[in-house]
């Protein structure tokens, strides 16, 4: 029967703190002079001053990391992970205790100059947010640490930078700026920059926090190759529990102390490495075929999902024309026109003429006539758009009976004088009919004189309005017309509605538009 190994085993349990439930290593267990240790921390404390009070971030951390190890640091927020990473990276100094990094002893008395040189020469950083210089290309970003170190010539720096970018799969992105790269590509440039000076330790602060599943697998494969092939020590802070199985040891932190240390079994780690390599091979095949893959589960690597970004292209023909709707409902329009009787005379209403009208309010109902060469487009119930071209064709298509409907309708230029006389005799209207002959000679309407002004096209969409003396309601007709156009149907208004004149609607629309 095959022996089953647990994924992790707890390394040492000493000096248990019942309140915090933490596990620490005694100082006697730390060999400060072990040459195999790339990092040794002994009773490290860090306290930040907040006013007159001190806030402890680290409280007696002791540990040793051997050269070439892969360490994962886990813990809740506020547990001291980032503070410990800053101290290891010489960005900050401990308040108390000693640390030995790459053979150099560091304490609270170490100068910033010594820390800066040690950081430049022996440590590489990979951050969650990449921290690339936006004004420099990928090649120039990788060259920057080598320029600061000053050990290579310009040609040697460029040659090494190209070699590093080729290693991380960015050979075709040398002259691209960070804004032109995806998140995974930026992280690969960050890794190339971090290893530019051949560091002994690579510090990783949430390196896959901003990446998707595919890029996470690619980055982890790249990091594990650096660890195994070039013997670079990796110390990674992460919240992704799926990444801990690639490491050698797992350090759990809580309240500024090491809670426990776990060691990952070789068999379990080997299985995860094999699965990672298979995933990366499949990713490479899909990328060659132009497909981006996402693994839904760990058991079936072939079960992938295509990803992509769709761009919507809109053309004028994609918009719905309400004119076509009116053509299909011409019977409804004719019925609404024929059923409108002499209600305006009974109510002592005012009639307003508009020679370019394509709809009329009759008997409290808004009806739309069939319009040729002029379309009203609407998309997703947004604001309607009107086309005021060829209004003369509209006028020629509108023939209403003025004697029966008491409306000032638009007839052909040959019948304009007769229609105006009928309107003046039957309706006693105070509209602009006295000058209709001259108006008709000048393309019949204000809207024809202002073909580029859409306000008059909207205002002329009603050829007569009933002005009732009962002021029981003060509703705006603009919203009603807007809804009517969007819905493409006739709106029903009650006879008690106080409708506005064309000039009033024009003024309202001027304020809105």
Curated annotation (Swiss-Prot):
Domain ABC transporter as annotated: residue spans: 39-280
Lineage of producing organism: Eukaryota, Amoebozoa, Evosea, Eumycetozoa, Dictyostelia
Annotated SUPFAM superfamilies: P-loop containing nucleoside triphosphate hydrolases
Region annotated Disordered, chain positions: 291-471
Family according to the record: Belongs to the ABC transporter superfamily.
Name of the protein this chain belongs to: ABC transporter H family member 2
Source organism per UniProt: Dictyostelium discoideum (Social amoeba)
A molecular function (GO) term: ATP hydrolysis activity
A Gene Ontology term for the protein's cellular component: plasma membrane
Superkingdom, natural source: Eukaryota
Any single GO BP term: transmembrane transport
Regions of compositional bias (Polar residues) in chain numbering: 361-386
Binding-site list for ATP: 75-82
Signal peptide: none
Gene designation: abcH2
Keywords: ATP-binding, Nucleotide-binding, Transport
Biased composition (Low complexity): 324-360, 387-471
């Amino acid at each position: 029967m095959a022996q089953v190994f647990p994924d992790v085993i707890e390394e040492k349990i000493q000096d248990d703190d019942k309140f915090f439930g933490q596990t620490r290593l005694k100082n006697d267990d730390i060999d400060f002079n072990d040459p195999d240790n790339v990092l040794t921390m002994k009773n490290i404390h860090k306290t930040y001053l907040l006013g007159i009070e001190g806030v402890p971030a680290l409280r007696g951390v002791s540990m040793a990391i051997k050269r070439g190890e892969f360490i994962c640091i886990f813990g809740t927020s506020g547990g001291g992970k980032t503070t410990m990473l800053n101290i290891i990276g010489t960005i900050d100094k401990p308040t108390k205790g000693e640390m030995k990094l790459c053979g150099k002893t560091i304490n609270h008395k170490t100068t910033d100059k010594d820390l800066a040189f040690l950081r430049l020469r022996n440590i590489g950083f990979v951050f969650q947010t990449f921290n690339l210089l936006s004004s420099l290309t990928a090649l120039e970003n990788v060259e920057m640490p080598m320029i600061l170190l000053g050990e290579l010539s310009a040609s040697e720096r460029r040659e090494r930078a190209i070699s590093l970018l080729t290693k991380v799969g960015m050979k075709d992105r040398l002259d691209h700026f960070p804004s032109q790269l995806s998140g995974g590509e930026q992280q690969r440039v960050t890794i190339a920059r971090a290893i530019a000076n051949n560091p002994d330790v690579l510090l990783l602060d949430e390196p896959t926090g901003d990446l998707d599943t595919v890029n996470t697998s690619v980055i982890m494969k790249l990091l594990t190759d650096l660890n195994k092939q070039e013997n670079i020590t990796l110390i990674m802070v992460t919240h992704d529990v799926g990444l801990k199985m690639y490491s050698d040891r797992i350090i759990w932190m809580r309240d500024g102390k090491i809670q426990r240390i776990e060691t990952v079994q070789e068999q379990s780690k080997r299985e995860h490495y094999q699965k990672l390599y298979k995933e990366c091979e499949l990713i490479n095949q899909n990328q060659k075929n132009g497909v981006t893959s996402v693994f839904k589960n760990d058991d079936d690597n072939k079960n992938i999902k295509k990803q992509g970004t769709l761009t919507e292209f809109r053309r004028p023909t994609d918009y719905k024309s309400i004119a076509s709707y009116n053509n299909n409902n011409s019977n409804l329009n004719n019925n609404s026109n024929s059923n409108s009787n002499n209600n305006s005379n009974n109510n002592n209403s005012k009639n307003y003429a508009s020679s370019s009208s394509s709809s009329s309010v009759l008997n409290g109902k808004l009806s739309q006539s069939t319009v040729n060469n002029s379309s009203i487009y609407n998309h997703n119930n947004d604001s309607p758009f009107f086309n005021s071209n060829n209004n003369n064709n509209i006028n020629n298509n509108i023939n209403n009976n003025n004697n029966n409907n008491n409306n000032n309708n638009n007839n052909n230029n040959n019948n304009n004088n007769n229609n105006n006389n009928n309107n003046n005799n039957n309706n006693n209207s105070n509209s602009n009919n006295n000058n209709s002959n001259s108006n008709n000679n000048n393309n019949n309407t204000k809207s024809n004189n202002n073909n580029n002004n859409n306000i008059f096209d909207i205002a002329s969409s009603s050829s007569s309005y009933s002005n009732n003396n009962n002021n029981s309601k003060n509703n705006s007709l603009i919203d009603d017309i807007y809804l009517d156009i969007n819905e493409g149907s006739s709106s029903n208004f009650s006879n008690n509605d106080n409708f506005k004149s064309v000039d009033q609607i024009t003024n309202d629309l001027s304020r809105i538009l």
